[in-house]
């Protein structure tokens, strides 16, 4: 009986001495995740174009974490794919294409206020300003497709002179007025001063008719010159 008691006490002492050696469970900590962003822009309907309407020459990418961690900015030239390492979490993304320059790190309010300078007679670079904004969540390796939206509208303009008016109406030139000099990328295209609007050059025209393609920024305030 004494032998049995000694065995039981020895077992308890051994178990107690081993309890301090048991590993403590800790939550898993994940490192940064591999996130790939792919940018595209659908072709516009119609066959006529005076700019490469879907071309992406450069991208300014801004990422703002929901937990107020430091924002990320990446400038990518001549590529439609950007790969980053990001911690798990929720983000707000802003992308701007075809500005032709690295806009650098900016606060979110300044990103939302970005505008693209616009020549009323058309794009100087042959490309169109584009942008995108969305939220996304990272929980592992992630691939995100970003659809860019053009910041200007395509207008197919044409006219003909009806036969009844051909003797009394003579057309010499055509020009568009009140064209904004800037295209809003995220906010409303609201012009606030006359100097922010201009007219296109006058294009020779005649009574036989005229047709052209224009790309026009938004003008909500109807400022005119």
Placement of each model-derived feature along the sequence:
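Conserved "repeat-terminator" motif of extracellular CCP/Sushi domains
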Residues: 145-152, 213-219
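Bacterial Sec-dependent N-terminal signal peptides
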Residues: 15-39, 145, 157
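Sec-dependent signal peptide recognition
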Residues: 2-9
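Tryptophan-paired
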Residues: 48-108, 163-222
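Short solvent-exposed capping/turn motifs at the termini of beta-strands
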Residues: 41-43, 161
């Amino acid at each position: 009986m004494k032998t049995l008691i000694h065995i039981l006490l020895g077992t308890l002492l051994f178990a107690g001495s081993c309890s301090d050696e048991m590993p403590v469970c800790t939550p898993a900590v994940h490192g940064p995740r591999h996130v790939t962003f792919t940018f595209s822009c659908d072709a516009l309907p119609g066959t006529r174009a005076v700019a490469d309407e879907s071309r992406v020459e450069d991208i300014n990418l801004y990422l703002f974490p929901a937990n107020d961690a430091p924002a990320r900015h990446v400038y990518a030239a001549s590529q439609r794919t950007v790969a980053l390492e990001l911690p798990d979490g929720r983000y707000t993304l802003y992308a701007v294409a075809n500005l032709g320059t690295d806009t650098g790190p900016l606060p979110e309010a300044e990103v939302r206020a970005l505008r693209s300078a616009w020549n009323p007679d058309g794009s100087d670079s042959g490309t169109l300003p584009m942008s995108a904004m969305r939220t996304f969540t990272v929980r592992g390796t992630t691939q995100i497709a970003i659809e860019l939206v053009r910041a200007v509208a395509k207008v197919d303009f044409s006219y003909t002179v009806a036969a009844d008016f051909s003797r009394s109406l003579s057309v010499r030139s055509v020009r568009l007025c009140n064209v904004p000099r800037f295209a809003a990328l995220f906010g409303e295209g609201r012009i606030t001063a006359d100097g922010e609007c201009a007219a296109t050059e006058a294009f020779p025209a005649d009574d036989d008719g005229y047709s052209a393609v224009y790309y026009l920024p938004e003008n909500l305030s109807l400022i005119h010159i």
